[in-house]
């Protein structure tokens, strides 16, 4: 079982090791990480994502966003997920949430459980639905979204790839399979 926890300064060493595992596998984009994949200073990243949780301090070019690590029973970081409370023009095709599971922990249902738990966060935040984008060729993520009640809405081109937008009704029990 996993739980979602907010990144803290105390998790620095573990978080850097988590990020490095992606890089070691040739993956230099960590979806749902609020640019953790591009940030060298973990403490500054923690401050930035904390600021983005509040209307008074959110970056003016961004939206209120909650970012969580998923930790397992041994308190090891196994994934990351974010929840963007609204969509601006930039995010309209990217959706309300992104997520990644560390390469060594994939195909264990972690992404499905992270998204299920994030639906509870969205519900508490008063959100009625989430829009999620996924590249058509990312079958594991498509299955994760569908398992959590995702309904296909439309397709679009993204970085020369075909991608789809799915919608999940937050207030529906279908989101809690």
Please give the residue ranges for each predicted region.
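Conserved catalytic-core motifs of GNAT/GCN5-like acyltransferases
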Residues: 133-134, 146-165
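Conserved GNAT acetyl-CoA-binding A-motif
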Residues: 122-133
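Conserved acetyl-CoA-binding loop-helix of GNAT-fold acetyltransferases
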Residues: 99-101, 107-120, 124, 143-147
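Conserved beta-strand-loop-alpha-helix junction that forms the acyl-donor binding cleft
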Residues: 132-142
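Residue-level recognition of the GNAT/N-acetyltransferase active site
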Residues: 98, 102, 135, 171
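Glycine-/small-residue-rich active-site loops that bind phosphorylated ligands and cofactors
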Residues: 89, 106-107, 137
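GNAT-family acyltransferases
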Residues: 1-96, 159-177
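Short secondary-structure boundary/hinge segments and terminal tails
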Residues: 123, 140, 162-164
């Amino acid at each position: 079982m996993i739980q979602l926890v907010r990144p803290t300064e105390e998790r620095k060493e573990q978080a850097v090791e988590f990020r490095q595992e992606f890089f070691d596998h040739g993956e230099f984009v960590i979806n749902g990480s609020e640019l953790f994949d591009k940030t060298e200073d973990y403490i500054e990243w923690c401050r930035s994502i904390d600021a983005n949780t509040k209307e008074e301090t959110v970056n003016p070019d961004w939206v209120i966003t909650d970012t969580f690590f998923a930790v397992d029973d041994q308190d090891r970081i196994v994934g990351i997920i974010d929840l963007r409370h609204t969509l601006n023009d930039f995010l309209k095709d990217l959706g309300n949430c992104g997520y990644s599971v560390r390469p060594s922990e994939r195909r264990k249902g972690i992404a499905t459980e992270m998204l299920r738990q994030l639906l509870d966060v969205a519900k508490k935040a008063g959100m009625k639905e989430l829009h999620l984008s996924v590249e058509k060729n990312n079958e594991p993520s498509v299955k994760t979204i569908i398992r959590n009640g995702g309904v296909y809405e439309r397709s679009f081109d993204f970085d020369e790839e075909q991608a789809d937008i799915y919608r999940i009704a937050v207030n529906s029990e279908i989101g809690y399979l």
